[in-house]
Amino acid sequence: MSFVGGGADCSANSNAIAQFNKHTQQDRSLQRQAANQQGIVQNGQGFKKDSMMNERERQNMDQFMNNGPSQSNFQFQPMRHELNMIQQNHKQPNVQNNWTNEFQTNSPSPVQRNTPLAKTGSPANAQWATEFQQPMDQTFNQSNQQQFNNMPNMRMGGYRPMMGMSMMGGGMHQQQNQMQHQEQNQDHQVDWDNQFKEIEQLTNETKDAEAEQVKGEEEPEIVIDDKYQATFQEVWDSLNSEEVENDFINQQYEEFKNTQRDSMPADMAQWEKDFAKYASTRAHFGDYQFEDNQHNQFLDLPKESDPYEIGLQLMENGAKLSEAALAFEAAIQRNEGHINAWLKLGEVQTQNEKEIAGISALEKCLELHPENSEALMTLAISYINEGYDNAAFATLERWISTKYPQVADQARQQNPAIDDEDRFSLNKRVTELFLNAAQLSPNSANMDPDVQMGLGVLFYANEDFDKTIDCFKAALSIKPDDAVLWNRLGASLANSNRSEEAVDAYFKALELKPTFVRARYNLGVSCINIGCYKEAAEHLLSGLSMHQVEGVQTDASSTLNHNQSTSLTETLKRAFIALDRRDLLEKVKPDMDINQFRGEFSF
């Protein structure tokens, strides 16, 4: 029996149909996977359709089906002829890019070069191949950014190609082609790092060009709302007006020094001359502005009723400070020389967070009674609050000269004239006076709390808050029920970044005097500093509500505007901004209705 052309299964009783059936039932999944195309196996079978056979092929088929075993079970010549025809009709396209030429030279694909199978593919693969064959420069210029951004979890510098597969050609070859490529082309290695570096360099150049183009474009004009323009203009005008005012004050001070230097009486004490010189550095706050008659019900009291006494009773009973202020105003309007009424009016207005009105009243009190120690101490603290340090130091020196004349006279004998206008020198000199006064009563039982108060103010001006706190605590050991001292201690603690302790001091002051508006204002500021914005707003609204007097209606033309507190409203705006409540911020304005906030805040 001959094995030549006999096939793998030869026997005496061999049946060609059975052999053919067995042959066609063999597992050819690898071959089908390698082809994976529709050009050769259009209908998933190995034969052409009858309509596609020529006459010779049909005769061979009939002869094969009708006759017994032939000398050769299979005739592959016609099929080989067809494959050669397909190869001739599908020539490889000319590649126009150097990168792809190098790619084909270094890593030739056996399927592409030796068989026509790789040239026949699905429409998707054919479209991809067409895009691949376009010039690389054109491709990157058009869509390089989009292509690289769409690569998930891949970085150009850290990518290593697997099994020799190009990142750009992952859809062309299947697993069998990759295995053949690895087996037959191990000697050809592609320098992928250089290829990707070139691509990355090209991409970076494109990005730089786009960045330059964007940078060169003109930025769009920013349109600012008219409301913010008006606000900016208002702030700018206020700054300019403040600068003009400061220049005017400095000019007045220079004129005062030139004209008043030789005009002081010869018998005037040196401390009085210094006070006149340094106190003039402050702004002139003008005369006190009284409320309109229609807004002050105490003006209508019968003559036998004393508005001054009523004001004292209101303060003692915990009434609103604004009501007590109206009573003292009525007493002054009855008698403009009422020294105590001016003093109490100044103290009430400073505690009511109306500093300017309080300063005007205290200055009037000192004009009537220059040696009033209570007015001097309160006025010095108000000057510190407003930033007139030299005027405050001169006022404190006047307080020492009034209450402890022996200390001031001894200092004047050692240094008769003071020509240095430096605030630090003035502070040092006045501090030495207060220290000398404190040494007169070293025993804590006989300690003068006002001396400790003055020392605390001097240390406060130098921002030595630790010493300030010690002085105020020493004063509180003598006067533990003084709400004003507790408030000043709280302010010192707050300025030394001890806001929690400051809150406790403010609460103590409010416990002693619930209508103490300045303590409520300071408490609101401390709440803002520790992030309690809603509580801060409630304290500030409570302070503003205490400025209102029952039965008194205010309007924009009322002189009440002269004695309103801007610090309360401005700090309330800060609290609303911190709460991100722009809707409430727009409601904060002079003569606003406080009751509109009661729905959200408790005060």
From Swiss-Prot:
Extent of motif WxxxF/Y motif 3: 192-196
GO molecular function: peroxisome matrix targeting signal-1 binding
Region of interest called Amphipathic helix 2 (AH2), as start-end residue ranges on this chain: 58-76
Record has Repeat as a keyword: yes
Keyword Cell membrane belongs to the record: no
Motif (WxxxF/Y motif 2): 128-132
Glycyl lysine isopeptide (Lys-Gly) (interchain with G-Cter in ubiquitin) cross-link site: 22
Residue ranges, annotated region (Disordered): 23-49
Region (Amphipathic helix 1 (AH1)): 11-33
Function comment: Receptor that mediates peroxisomal import of proteins containing a C-terminal PTS1-type tripeptide peroxisomal targeting signal (SKL-type). Binds to cargo proteins containing a PTS1 peroxisomal targeting signal in the cytosol, and translocates them into the peroxisome matrix by passing through the PEX13-PEX14 docking complex along with cargo proteins. PEX5 receptor is then retrotranslocated into the cytosol, leading to release of bound cargo in the peroxisome matrix, and reset for a subsequent peroxisome import cycle.
Quaternary organization: Interacts (via WxxxF/Y and LVxEF motifs) with PEX14; promoting translocation through the PEX13-PEX14 docking complex.
PANTHER family (alphabetical): GH08708P, PEROXISOMAL TARGETING SIGNAL 1 RECEPTOR PEX5
Protein name from the UniProt record: Peroxisomal targeting signal receptor
Organism classification: Eukaryota, Fungi, Dikarya, Ascomycota, Saccharomycotina
Gene that this polypeptide is encoded by: PEX5
